[in-house]
Structure formats: structure tokens, C-alpha cells
């Protein structure tokens, strides 16, 4: 049985902002970015538990897309088989950017 993947509005905004930036650099590159992020979502539907926990008390994990230097940061609610995407941020951004979304 697959997991349900739900993106928070902030994560959707992250994706849109990054895609817009990539499209400003090269036509169509933002669409490739979105395709790559959606591929990550598809993989998370299969088994989000493959990724290490990144928080001592919460079930927070992340996965990198294949081509772009971004992290898809998510929380796993095992008893409900739900994956909540909280942030899609550049890998170089400080952890405080996504941590405040889990408070």
C-alpha cells in the first residue's frame, strides 16, 4: 500500500519560486525542476522510511532530487501512512529555514 504525500502551502511556494528562478535562467529548466521534485514525491509514496531521521524527537527526513541542489524535507506520520512535505529548499540554505516550519 502506498503512502499519501501531502505538500504544505509553504512547500508549494518553495517549488514555484525555485521553478520561476530556473525558468529565468533557461527556458524550460523550471519545468524540469518541477518534474524532478514530482519524481521525488513519487518515490516517497513507495517508501519514505528509506531516508534517515534528521531530527532527534520528530520523524523528519529529507531526500535530494537527482539533478538539482535542493532538499525535499518531510515529516512521516507512520500510523496514518502520510508524508507531509514541509519544505523544498536549496541544499546550501541553513537548517533554521526549515526547522521553524516544524514548531
Spans of model-derived segments:
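Short, hydrophobic secondary-structure boundary micro-motifs
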Residues: 31-32, 52-54, 97
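Basic/aromatic recognition patch in beta-strand/loop cores that engages polyanionic ligands
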Residues: 39, 46-82
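Enriched for short, Lys/Arg-rich terminal
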Residues: 71, 75-103
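Generic structural signal for secondary-structure transition and capping sites
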Residues: 20, 27, 42, 46-50, ...
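Residue-level recognition of specific faces of alpha-helices
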Residues: 14, 21, 36, 40-43, ...
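Arg/Lys-rich, positively charged N-terminal/basic patches that mediate binding to nucleic acids
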Residues: 1-36
Amino acid at each position: 500500500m502506498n503512502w499519501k504525500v501531502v505538500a504544505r502551502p509553504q512547500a508549494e511556494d518553495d517549488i514555484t519560486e525555485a521553478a520561476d528562478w530556473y525558468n529565468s535562467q533557461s527556458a524550460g529548466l523550471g519545468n524540469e525542476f518541477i518534474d524532478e521534485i514530482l519524481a521525488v514525491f513519487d518515490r516517497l509514496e513507495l517508501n519514505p522510511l528509506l531516508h534517515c531521521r534528521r531530527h532527534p524527537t520528530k520523524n523528519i527526513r529529507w531526500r535530494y532530487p537527482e539533478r538539482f541542489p535542493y532538499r525535499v524535507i518531510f515529516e512521516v506520520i507512520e500510523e496514518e501512512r502520510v508524508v507531509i512535505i514541509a519544505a523544498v529548499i536549496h541544499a546550501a540554505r541553513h537548517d533554521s529555514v526549515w526547522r521553524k516550519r516544524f514548531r
